[in-house]
Amino acid sequence: GDVYKRQVKEFASKENAEVILISAKIESEINELDSPEEKKIFLEDIGMQEPGSSKLIRSTYKLLNLHTFFTAGKKEVRAWTVGIGQNAYDAAGQIHSDFQKGFICSEVISYNDYIDNGSEIKSKEAGKMRLEGKDYIVEDGDIMHFRFNI
């Protein structure tokens, strides 16, 4: 238990590495809960803010220098991965080569603006949607729509 945790943390510290402790039992219990509210209460009861799996994913993205951006349509919201520092043109190519070939611009709402306004429509109404060109550097959590013409 705690002896092994301490040894792993000490070793990782010497190697300048991050340690993320994950309990398979706790992760399993979290996944068995039905609602986000139940999960939140369970996590609070055991002194955690988020599941270990979420920490692992975030840490892996950081280690690999990756960001996530989102596209949203009437039927589907999808997360896409792009390298940190990549631009809108590169992001368009992640979705489809035609998006990249015929790239005109991208409509972008930042993650924080989206959360603050509660929806894409309300973000647009608040003037938080902007048009960006090929060289726009994609930020983590951006909600993007690509305009293209082939």
Residue ranges: model-predicted function:
Residues E15-I22:
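Conserved beta-strand/loop subsegment of P-loop NTPase cores
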